[in-house]
UniProtKB/Swiss-Prot annotation:
InterPro entries, alphabetized: P-loop_NTPase, PanK, PRK/URK
Record localization: Cytoplasm
Entry binding sites for ATP: G97, S98, V99, A100, V101, G102, K103, S104
Keywords: ATP-binding, Coenzyme A biosynthesis, Cytoplasm, Kinase, Nucleotide-binding, Transferase
Gene Ontology biological process: coenzyme A biosynthetic process
Name under which the protein is recorded: Pantothenate kinase
Cellular component GO terms held in the UniProt record: cytoplasm
UniProt similarity note: Belongs to the prokaryotic pantothenate kinase family.
Length: 319
């Protein structure tokens, strides 16, 4: 049973412990192996097959119900308009949350689970990293220290991409981002061709912006979502995960001479950790408090993590 304490009766969410949430899996089959989960998870994210059983299978079942309801509504609208020429549009899932909280792992695991539904839907995954302005532009505008903040994204390009996806247009292109060079890759794109489901993941996907004074309509990125997920965790844990990940990257990816952060791989450990702490405090913590955490109440589903990246509580928006 969900925990309906008095203060939560007035919440738009129903709250479940991870153990109670796991029961909603029902007969949803586990279609991933331990090796596949290991391949899908991000650096420093220890999610395993047991966590897939506890949390992700119930999520998969819930999303299946939402997709089926969307398909039924589409059919009913065809009857309403007495038309069989309508273009079926993809079901879009948005995934938001802080840097280092585990968004990418969640997105990749969900993609694999959804792809393996009995209906075998075509599922694509795009991150907002590719929609960051190129480093040359950020440097010219003095925004390199604000990378990841709302103003560092080409929001117009995001909206055009999602508009095309929702319009059912073929071969929509999304820019590709390199975490090695820490920049958008010039001239390279992921081509998304009318998927059944699109997962759109990034720290900024639930953010709103100020309405224009001239009264013109301005869509938000989340206006295109059929379902949204926020990955949550206590601030001190995200801090710990960010610094730990930085230090592990220092021993791995940063050692590549082509890495934007290669210079950090040669620093003494104490100095490198100091830099990681400064990056967290001056950039990522500030962005979390100002722009990311305030969007949490806009999500349909909130996964609250505890130690070891394990989900401890799930909040599902009431219908």
């Amino acid at each position: 049973m969900d925990q309906l304490v008095p203060a939560e009766r007035y919440s738009p969410y129903r709250f479940f412990s991870a153990e109670d949430w796991a029961k909603f899996r029902a007969d949803t089959p586990l279609t991933l192996t331990e090796d596949e989960v290991r391949r899908l998870r991000s650096l420093n994210d220890p999610v395993n097959l047991e966590e897939v059983r506890r949390i992700y299978l119930s999520m998969s079942r819930l999303l299946s119900a939402h997709v089926e309801a969307s398909q039924l509504l589409f059919q009913q609208r065809q009857v309403f308009f007495d038309s069989d020429h309508a273009v079926k549009t993809p079901f879009i899932i948005g995934i938001a949350g802080s840097v280092a909280v585990g968004k990418s792992t969640t997105a990749r695991v969900l993609k694999e689970l959804l792809t393996r539904w009995p209906s075998s839907p075509k599922v694509d995954l795009i991150t907002t990293d590719g929609f960051l302005l190129p480093n040359a532009v950020l440097s010219h505008e003095g925004l390199m220290e604000r990378k990841g903040f709302p103003e560092s994204y080409d929001v117009g390009a995001i909206l055009r991409f999602l508009s095309g996806i929702k319009a059912g247009l073929p071969n929509m292109r999304a820019p590709i981002y390199s975490h090695l060079t820490y920049d958008v890759v010039p001239g390279e794109f992921a081509v998304i061709d009318r998927p059944d489901i699109l997962i759109f993941e990034g720290i900024n996907v639930l953010q709103t912006r100020d309405l224009p004074r001239d009264g013109k309509a301005v869509p938000f990125v989340s206006d295109f979502f059929d379902f949204s997920i926020y990955i949550d965790a206590p601030e001190e844990l995200i801090h710990e995960w960010y610094v730990d990940r930085f230090m592990r990257l220092r021993e791995t990816a940063f050692r590549d001479p082509n890495s934007f952060f290669h210079r950090y791989s040669t620093l003494p450990e104490v100095e490198a950790r100091t830099i990681a702490e400064e990056l967290w405090t001056n950039i990522n913590l500030k962005n979390l408090r100002e722009n990311i955490l305030p969007t949490r109440p806009r999500a349909d589903l909130i996964l609250r993590k505890g130690t070891n990246h394990l989900v401890q509580e799930v909040a599902l928006r009431k219908l």
